[in-house]
Amino acid sequence: MTLLRHLLTATALLGASVQAAQGVTGSPFGFASGTTGGGDATPAAPSDISQLKTWLSDSTPRVILIDKEFNFLGSEGKCTNCECCKPASNTCGSSGQNAVKQNGSDWCGSYPTLTCTYDNAGIEGLEVASNKSIVGVGSSGVLRGKGLRLVNGVSNIIIQNIHITELNPEFIWGGDAITLDGTNNVWIDHVKINLIGRQMFVAGYEASHSVTISNSEFDGETSWSATCDGHHYWTVLGYGHNDKITFANNYIHHTSGRSPKLEFNSFWHAYNNYWYNNTGHAFDVGKNTRALIEGNVMVQVDTPLLADSNPGAVFAVNTSDVSTCTSTLGRTCVPNTLISSGTLSGSDSSVISSWPSGESDVTVMAASKVASYVKANAGIGKLGNGSGSSSTVGAAATSAVAKRADSDDAPFVPAYSEAGPGASAVPTQPSWSWRTVTNGPAPTGAPSDSPSAPQGLGAPVQASNKHHHQGHGRGY
């Protein structure tokens, strides 16, 4: 028995050392196909948070190994007895989320003012320059107290196998885990995100082309919930104009909204994701966005698709329209499966007919395989289980339209045990940041979440309410 333990330990260490030597595992697929990150740069691990900051932001192509926890808590001091507010959504006191009052923003409006203490490091993420691979080693790669920020035209970045956590989870505006704004070729893979104050992932107003988010875990279990139910509301937000994003093989659980919320002339392909225990809404598709939703599984999701007063186009595949994809995509689409959930409907064929080129190496598996696959593969420390990349899932195709669906694409109802566990301002500059906010005009028609009045832009919307586009701003 002792020998067996030693063998298992040696095997694990060997796997970690092999990964450390090679850097990125697998190859990007979907819209991020062709992304190389730091390329063939020699993988290296920074010694401390100062060196990590430097390596992330310099102009040198790098493969940066995150081989331990980098703890940013306290590294930029704390804001003590600073001004916050209590939004109307917080009806549960210390179990809810109050909001940091940001300079230059009137998001707090007439909400009661409070004093609060929060960690400065979490408010804004680490700047990431072009041509970087950020790769966690084994299960050790943790960024605590600070996220990542990709803005101002950066490109060719891979983020793989890391855990981002503890960004002022008590506070709205406490920080975002991963921010994109004006990027190209970004692959986010095998990332775990939890205990975040604001968005787990956000794409800002500037277009983020050629992005894939895959095999990642969005863990919404929290002690500070904007919806007062232990579920995180601010999950995935796509606000970029003309974003092209593949969202595949992800595990989204214990959330209550924005899972995802999408706007503004973008294309999102969401396939083979597993949603579990969402007490509010999953998809919120607005203003000119086109969403292709196929081969997903939703279990205990109250509102799979939120009604919107200005909706975008949704093609959510069911058994009756799988053949609609054939003429344009060259394959049948794969039906979604919903268990103990609300309705996911949408059959706007313009999504299919207008689908852009550039999404490649896509294989959509049957819903019958999704729950077990995603639970085994999504998140940190699971690279050896299969990356979901073109090298492990399927042979390359010239585009998404050319790739055949999994042959076993009949709808599936799994056994239940398989389910698993105010108005504000907008940045007037391309560099999208919560700190650099002015009171300039917002882009035309920017939407807002609005539960029962009087709510500010960006407040959590209740599943039973429709959108009211009553303001403009950065209130994401």
From Swiss-Prot:
Q: Which InterPro entries match?
A: Pec_lyase, Pectin_lyas_fold, Pectin_lyase_fold/virulence, PEL
Ranges for region Disordered: 412-476
One BP term from GO: cell wall organization
Disulfide feature = 84-108, 325-333
Q: Where does the UniProt annotation locate this protein?
A: Secreted
Is the keyword DNA-binding assigned to this protein? no
Regions of compositional bias (Basic residues) in chain numbering: 465-476
- Reactions mediated catalytically: Eliminative cleavage of (1->4)-alpha-D-galacturonan methyl ester to give oligosaccharides with 4-deoxy-6-O-methyl-alpha-D-galact-4-enuronosyl groups at their non-reducing ends
Q: Where does this protein chiefly localize? A: secreted
Q: What EC designation does it have?
A: 4.2.2.10
The broad enzyme category this protein falls into is lyase
Which protein family is it in?
Belongs to the polysaccharide lyase 1 family.
Name of the protein this chain belongs to: Probable pectin lyase F
Question: What species was this sequence derived from?
Answer: Aspergillus niger (strain ATCC MYA-4892 / CBS 513.88 / FGSC A1513)
State the gene name recorded for this protein: pelF
